[in-house]
Every structure is written in C-alpha cells, then in structure tokens.
Swiss-Prot record:
Cofactor requirements of the protein: FMN
InterPro entries found in the cross-reference section: Aldolase_TIM, DUS-like_FMN-bd, tRNA_hU_synthase_CS, Znf_CCCH
Compositional bias of kind Low complexity: 188-203
Active-site annotation: C488 (proton donor)
Organism expressing this protein natively: Malassezia globosa (strain ATCC MYA-4612 / CBS 7966)
Catalysis performed (reactions): 5,6-dihydrouridine(47) in tRNA + NAD(+) = uridine(47) in tRNA + NADH + H(+); 5,6-dihydrouridine(47) in tRNA + NADP(+) = uridine(47) in tRNA + NADPH + H(+); a 5,6-dihydrouridine in mRNA + NAD(+) = a uridine in mRNA + NADH + H(+); a 5,6-dihydrouridine in mRNA + NADP(+) = a uridine in mRNA + NADPH + H(+)
Uppermost EC category: oxidoreductase
Similarity annotation: Belongs to the Dus family. Dus3 subfamily.
Gene Ontology biological process terms in this record: mRNA processing
EC code(s) of this entry: 1.3.1.89, 1.3.1.-
Zinc finger intervals, C3H1-type: 97-126, 216-241
Name the UniProt record assigns to this protein: tRNA-dihydrouridine(47) synthase [NAD(P)(+)]
Localization in the cell: Cytoplasm; Nucleus
C-alpha cells in the first residue's frame, strides 16, 4: 500500500503510468493511430481545477492547440510536456447547421408551405436528403423511457450493456479507420457494420443513401413521433421506404415529394406518452415534457419595454421611502426602529394613483385612508407571511445551481440517480427583463423534477423586484422557490455590485430580499451565500437578520470566501456557527414581548455546501454542522451517481460500461431537449464534452489503495481496468469528442471544442 500524499489520489502501483499516453488506446485493445494528443507528465497544481462554470460566465474563445506532427519531426514526440495552466477565457463555439436550410413546414411532414415561393427556405426535399449526412446509428434501449439502466432487470441490463459496448467499439473502430484512410469520403453512403447494426438501403439511390433504417431516435422511441421530422439525424427510425426516389424512378416515385419515403408514427407510444403522470404537467402543451415556457407575446413586450408591472413600482417606491426614513435617523434610532424590518407593507392603490398624473387628490387620500385593503386586482392582493409556502426541506438532496453544466439534461440525469431539489442555472436580472430567450430558457423545468427553483443575480432592488414579479406571474406555477445569488465570485458580476458583492452590503441585500419576497407572492425566496468576500468571515451577521428581519424562506452557505475560490477546504465549522446564529436569532425573536401575539417562528432550512464527495462526507456534515441538508456541486459534476451512494450509504465501484450508459443517457436527454437535428446534435455534443471535462476526474474505487478519497486529491497518470475505463479517465478533450462520436456520430470537420482548462485542449482536424 502506497503512502498517502496530500493532494494526490492514492492509486495502486499496478495502475500507475509515468505520463498520459501520446496515443489513446482503442476500445478493441489496439493502439489508436489517428489521435493528435501528446504525452503529458503529472504536474500537481497549487489550486485544483474543479471549478464550476460560475468562474467563467461567458463561453467564448478559439482553440489554440497545435498538431503534434511538427513536434514529431523534431524528435519531441515522446517527451513528456508540462501541462498548460490556467483557463481558456472568453470561449466561442461554432453553430453547426445543415448545408441546405429546409423549410420547417416541409420538415415536419407537410406537402406544401403556406408561404409558397416567397419562403426563404428550400422545399426541395430530395436535394436536402442528398446533402444530408448519414444517419447516426444507435442501439435500442431496453425500455422506452431512456432512464438509468440500473432500473432494468439484471439479465436485460447485462445484455444491453454488452450490446452498448459492442456498438461503442464498432463506432470507435470506424472513426480510427476514417482518420487513417486519407482516401475515405467525408460522408460514405455505407460503412462497416456488425451483423446487428442498422443498415442503409442497399441501393445507389442518392436521396435514400443517408438513411439508416433501424437506428434509434430518442424522440420516437419515447413518444412515438419526432418533431424534427426529415431534419432528424436518426431519420431511419421513423420513415418507411415505399419505393426508389425520383432520382431513379422519376415521376413514378412514391412517398413525400418524390423521396420514396414517408414519415411514420407509433400510435401506441403516442397514446402512452400523452397519458403519462409526471410531477408537473404542461397543460397547454401535453406533448412536451417541459414546463415554464415564456409566451412569445410576453417576450416581445419585455424586449420592447411595454410590459406592465403591477407590483414592482410600488414596492421599489416603498423601499426608497424606507431608505429616506432611515437616513434621517441617528444610528441609535435606526438600530431600534422597526423600519426596514419584517414584511414589506405596500399600498398598491395609493402608489398607483400617485404615479398617475390624472388622479385626483381626493382619490389619493381615499386610497391612503383605506390602507390599500380595497384591492381591485387580484394579482396585487398582498400575501401575508403565514400564507407563503413553507419549504419543508429536511435531508433532501440538493443539486447546486451550476452555470453551463447545470443544464436541464444534466439535472434530469442527476434526478435518475436520486437528487431531490434542483435549482436552474444563474440568470441575470437585466436579461430576464429584456426578454432574452437564452435567459428565459434557464427557468425551463423537466416535468419529473420534484422540487425546482430558479436562481437570479442582480445588484439592486430596481432590477430584482421586477424580475421577481414577472417570474411569479408568467412561470410561477412551475417554480417551487426563487433563489438570489449572493455568492458568485467572478469579477464581471462582483464589480457590478452583484453576486458575492452583496455580502458586504447587508442593508441593500435586506431590501432586495423583502422586495422580492413581496413581489413573489406565495413563492418562497432563498439566498445562496459564501462565508465572505475576504479571508475574514462575515456572513454570520447576515444569518442573524435573514429570517427574523427579512423573512427569507431558506439559506444555503458555501464554506469558502470569494477570495478563497477552491484553494482551501470548505469551512464547515463556520457553517455550523452560522446555523447556530440563525437558530439563536429565531429563539430571541420568539421570546420578545412585542411578538407575543404572533405565531412562533420556526427556523427555515439551512443547507451547507463544499467538498461533499461521498456519503460519509454528507452524513458527517449533517450530524456535526447542524444543517438541514447539503448542497452538492462539484461532487455531482465528477460523479453524478453520488446521490445514489448517499441514499444507499454505500461506495459504488461503478463499472466502465455503466458509466458509458450514463453518457448515453445524457446524450438522449440532450437530444430531446436541444433537438435531434444537426444543430441540436452538436449542441448536445458541446455540453456532453463540458460534462466529460468533470466526469473524467473520477478515479474508480477499484484503483485506489484506500477510501474515502478527498475531492481535491488529483490523480497521477493511470490506466483503468479495461480500455474503456482508461478512455473515460482521459484528460484530453480529443478523447471527450471521441466519446461523443459513439452516440452523436462523427463531429463535423468545422466543429471544435475549447475546454475551460488549457491543459485539456482539443481542435478538430478537418
């Protein structure tokens, strides 16, 4: 047994390598000859590079890797090279689309387009299919839901995993052969297949050459129909061949627009899909498995600044009046006054009349005299604190909001492993109010997410209060809570006064919380915090006021400061101090005589966050830090099955084939979320590579000298127990794209992926 060195994972000697290999090993056991990666020596970093994407909110930059061919000529091919350090900031990603833009109405199966000849897109379906890349080949899943394979009976699971692995080997072999065969066509009409593999029609028909009959479309297998229609990259799963195309038979060709093919649907699957019973159903679009869609007319009014806010102007006006009142007081008076504490009381009718130039003085006085109790509109009726939904979180597993990587397919993947509470990716308040489609897509909820909220980030009440109102009004039915980000450490956010900058401005944070809570109505508001902005922790002062003065519905605390980032271990002792501070504040509030006639206040749930990498960490923090639960971030990124380990209290030595099926599972979820057309496939590929940039850091338990292992322990170069395990552990982005090829087909020649960390660089070779 090796001696443990802090910061280095204790891998058994028989699995160690001197450097990461220059040529990746193929899944059939041979050495790949088409890779352009180089050997990399193990160089421990001072700071572990397991940072969530919140470190870098923009996704933009060009790849900067160079081919190893020139280095090989100079005799440098086999020399280990020190890994590049730092991040690729400002990354950019290419938008890959079809060479020919097919009309959407034609693509979905209509014989004609309502725009006729004036349509900007092509209606020539035969020409489109001739230029379309070959269908992607995938084996069928044992069940139609594409859920985690561990729910499949053992005998079926073993057969399926073997089939999946054979498919991966076949696709990998094809890719290597293509990379080494310089005379190969870019999109061959047919390729090498196993006896059980899907096959293209045995014809020289150029229209039908790209169709692979028998492949599996994730949409069609689950729902009995595919909304992508003819644009689907798995077209062979939902077409029927009637005859040859017009290129062979001319006018005698059958099928749609002379293709010799027709789209098909599975009525039994369609019926089963429409009669499913999810946690949250989209009543307006029962065929969709997602809720919280923003209506197009609402987005248009937001973009043109014509959206009417009923609550926000009155709330922000009331908050400004409180600021004026407090500024006129002495420090002693401000400390003892009730101004700025407790639920915000807003006279909406009076504020509306004051802002209306045509309102009479008598009407304003009547509204002021009535105290706003005679509300004419139901959506401005005040919700009392006791009417707010209380968060009953105790021991539920909370997947942290993760920018870029915490997308809907990843949350769905974690849900299949047992996560309970999900929070969407951080969205900026300004972008919500401007109606940006990319920002509003972050509030999208999969129908199977049991508890779901969205996270917003902003610097002042004038932005966050209107955001809270529009969220509550437009998608409030699909939100269980709204979270305010008070922990984002990146300079772009911090310098605007948002994120962790709010930790140094508690009074402003209090106004934000009270204003948003009023605008949200019955929806609870939570806040996500860090220990402070510098090495001196200050957040316990916020915990003393968060519930008793501001009425927050829940808190989560990351046990690191903004300055620390991920350089040191999370401070769970300080998390306990903050929890105890909140409990003491609630106890004191209940004992004060002025609150004797009010119901006793019950402490809201508090979740800790930081360095939870196994079930032992989870239960240890639950017991000693006095938290109601633990929020899991990097632990879920590196091994999404951590939720299963926690619930079953076991160390799961997951096999390489089970991990491969998890990747297949994510790809299926991505295709049903972003689409199975060319653009959707490559969007899925990009985010799959983002996920693999974290999951490759997992060190299989069977390779370790002892467990548990610490999250910040980085592994030296090692090989797995089989070629697939070695491939899944590769730190090279080249291999991540290679893995994506198994389920999403070969990456287009112009497609590239720039990893967040420079040490993982990859560039597609055309």
């Amino acid at each position: 047994m090796s001696v443990y060195k802090p910061g280095i994972a204790p891998i058994k000697a028989q699995f160690l390598r001197t450097a990461w290999p220059a040529r990746s090993e193929a899944l059939d056991g041979s050495t790949e000859t088409g890779a352009d990666s180089e050997p990399t020596a193990f160089v421990p970093d001072d700071e572990p590079d397991g940072k969530p994407e919140q470190e870098n909110p923009t996704d933009a930059a060009a790849p900067t890797t160079s081919s190893g061919a020139n280095r090989a000529q100079d005799g440098e091919q086999d020399k280990p090279r020190k890994r590049a350090r730092g991040q690729n900031k400002g990354r950019t990603f290419t938008r890959t689309e079809d060479n020919i833009a097919l009309c959407t109405q034609i693509a979905t199966g209509r014989d004609a387009c309502k725009f006729g000849d004036s349509c900007k897109f092509t209606h020539d379906l035969c020409t489109y299919l001739e230029q379309k890349p070959r269908d992607i080949e995938t084996p069928p899943h044992p069940v139609s839901s594409h859920e985690c394979v561990r729910f499949v009976p053992a005998d079926e699971r073993d057969v399926y995993l073997a089939t999946l692995y054979e498919h991966a080997v076949m696709q990998d072999t094809k890719r290597i052969k293509k990379n080494t065969d310089v005379t190969a066509d870019a999109h061959p009409a047919s390729g090498s297949t196993t006896p059980s593999a899907p096959t293209a029609p045995t014809t020289h028909d150029t229209v039908q050459a790209s169709v692979v009959l028998g492949t599996t479309c994730p949409y069609f297998q689950e729902r009995g129909t595919c909304p992508m229609g003819w644009k689907c990259r798995f077209l062979g799963a939902h077409v029927r061949r009637l005859s040859a195309s017009c290129r062979v038979l001319g006018a005698e060709a059958q099928g749609m627009l002379g293709t010799g093919l027709e789209l098909v649907e599975d009525e039994a699957k369609k019926h089963a899909w429409l009669h499913r019973s999810p946690y949250m159903r989209n009543e307006a679009q029962p065929e969709s498995d997602q809720v919280n869609w923003l209506a197009s007319d609402v987005a248009r009014r937001l973009r043109s600044r014509k959206y009417t806010f009923d609550k926000a102007p009155a709330i922000t006006s009331a908050l400004r009046k409180e600021v004026d009142m407090l500024s006129a007081m002495t420090p002693a008076e401000a400390a003892s006054t009730e101004v700025g504490k407790g639920p915000l009381r807003v006279n909406y009718e009076h504020e509306r009349l004051v802002a209306d130039p045509s309102a009479t003085l008598e009407a304003c006085e009547d509204a002021l005299r009535n105290g706003g109790n005679d509300d004419a509109a139901a959506d401005t009726a005040r919700v009392r604190p006791c009417e707010k939904r209380r968060l009953q979180w105790k021991g539920d597993l909370y997947l942290a909001p993760l920018t870029t990587t915490g997308n809907l397919p990843f949350r769905r993947l974690c849900a299949s492993f047992g996560s309970d509470i999900h929070c969407g990716e951080m969205g900026m308040a300004e972008s919500f109010l401007q109606g940006h489609a990319s920002e509003w897509s972050l509030v999208r909820r999969w129908e199977g997410e049991r508890i779901f909220g969205t996270q917003v980030c902003g610097a002042k009440p004038e932005l966050l209060v209107p955001t809270a109102e529009v969220l509550a009004r437009e998608v409030g039915r699909g939100l269980d809570f709204v979270d305010v980000n008070c922990g984002c450490p990146i300079d772009l956010v911090y310098n605007k006064g948002a994120g962790s900058a709010l930790l140094d401005h508690a009074n402003k944070l209090g106004r934000i919380v009270r204003g948003m809570s009023e605008a949200l109505g019955e929806i609870p508001l939570t806040i996500k915090l860090r220990t402070g902005t510098t090495s001196k922790p200050t957040t316990h002062k916020i915990f003393a006021r968060a519930q008793t003065e501001w009425g927050v519905g829940g808190l989560s605390l990351h046990g690191r400061s903004r300055k620390q980032r991920y350089k040191n271990d999370a401070d769970w002792a300080y998390i306990r101090t903050c929890v105890d501070t909140l409990h003491d504040a609630v106890r004191t509030w209940n004992e004060e005589p002025q609150h004797a006639d009010e119901p006793d206040m019950v402490p809201v749930p508090v979740y800790g966050n930081g360095d939870v990498y196994g079930w032992r960490d989870y239960y240890d923090h639950l017991e000693h830090a006095h938290v109601d639960g633990t929020m899991i971030a990097r632990g879920a990124l590196i091994k999404p099955w951590i939720f299963t380990e926690i619930k079953e209290r076991r160390d799961w030595d997951i096999s390489s084939r089970e991990r491969l099926d998890m990747i297949r599972q994510y790809a299926s979820y991505g295709l049903t979320h972003w689409g199975s057309d060319t653009q959707g496939v490559n969007t899925t590929r990009r985010f799959l590579c983002e996920m693999l940039s974290f999951t490759h850091r997992y060190v299989p338990l069977g390779l370790l000298d002892h467990i548990p292992v610490r999250m910040n322990d980085r592994p030296p170069p090692f090989h797995g127990r089989d070629p697939l395990e070695s491939l899944l552990s590769s730190p090279s982005a080249h291999d991540w794209v290679r893995i994506s090829d198994m389920f999403l087909g070969p990456a287009p020649p112009d497609w590239h992926f720039t990893p967040k960390h420079r040490s993982n660089a990859y560039e597609q070779q055309g």
